[in-house]
């Protein structure tokens, strides 16, 4: 007669499988796994994450949710998500058929060095083009949209007449090899909420996913504006 009881190891495996799914399946539209899918579609429609490029991660307490590598952003579903414990950097959930995002160590840098709540990586054409025109930093001032960007080192946002400074780091053959340069830029520019990568794109983070989204949109607007100003011979930093 066959037994109706499972071994302890089998029970553990079943419980683990269920708990892994519970990490990403929710009817709550604000759940990180659902938000990542929603935002990936928005970024795809904006032309920022074509051809599976780019990435996004959202932090919820000690857990971080990360969009996978190799999945078309407009087709992303919650079941595609990786989930990691921030402190141990161990995966709590790994989709069997997908690869972790190569952006993960850079996301971790934003979480641990800036206590970010979310980090966005896009391949925005404006971001790429600006890095071909500027050397070590991108600078712009006296544009109203600058007021959407935080001061970071003190309370409040930048003012109209303030100068926005975003460091530019050199690209590498592999995404994860950008980690040291990004960390160095974060240390050297404590007031920045973004880092540009030459001929590649941009990383933007914020206290919450919504703030990161606002910063990303505002910065991309400013980058596009800077390109048009350059074409017309207008300095991006207003001269007194």
From Swiss-Prot:
SUPFAM superfamilies recorded: AraD/HMP-PK domain-like
Reaction(s) catalysed by this chain's protein: 5-(methylsulfanyl)-D-ribulose 1-phosphate = 5-methylsulfanyl-2,3-dioxopentyl phosphate + H2O
Active-site residues per Swiss-Prot or TrEMBL entry: 144
UniProt name for this protein: Methylthioribulose-1-phosphate dehydratase
PANTHER family the record matches: METHYLTHIORIBULOSE-1-PHOSPHATE DEHYDRATASE
Domain of life: Eukaryota
Main location: cytoplasm
């Amino acid at each position: 007669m066959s037994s109706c009881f499972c071994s302890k190891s089998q029970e553990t495996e079943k419980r683990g499988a269920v708990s892994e799914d519970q990490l990403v399946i929710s009817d709550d539209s604000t759940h990180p796994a659902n938000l990542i899918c929603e935002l990936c579609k928005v970024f795809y429609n904006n032309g920022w994450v074509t051809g599976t490029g780019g990435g996004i991660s959202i932090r919820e307490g000690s857990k971080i949710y990360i969009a996978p590598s190799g999945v078309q952003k407009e087709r992303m579903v919650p079941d595609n998500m990786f989930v990691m414990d921030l402190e141990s950097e161990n995966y709590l959930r790994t989709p069997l058929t997908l690869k972790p995002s190569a952006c993960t160590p850079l996301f971790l840098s934003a979480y641990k060095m800036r206590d970010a709540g979310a980090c966005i990586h896009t391949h925005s054409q404006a971001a790429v083009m600006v890095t071909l025109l500027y050397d070590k930093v991108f600078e712009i001032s006296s544009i109203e949209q600058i007021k959407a960007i935080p001061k970071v080192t003190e309370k409040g946002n930048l003012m109209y007449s303030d100068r926005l400074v975003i460091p530019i780091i050199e690209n590498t053959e592999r995404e994860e090899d950008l980690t040291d340069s990004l960390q160095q830029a974060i240390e050297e520019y404590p007031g920045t909420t973004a880092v540009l990568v030459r001929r590649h794109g941009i990383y933007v983070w914020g206290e919450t996913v919504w703030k990161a989204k606002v910063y990303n949109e505002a910065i991309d607007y400013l980058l596009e504006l800077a390109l048009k100003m350059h074409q017309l011979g207008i300095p991006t930093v207003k001269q007194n």
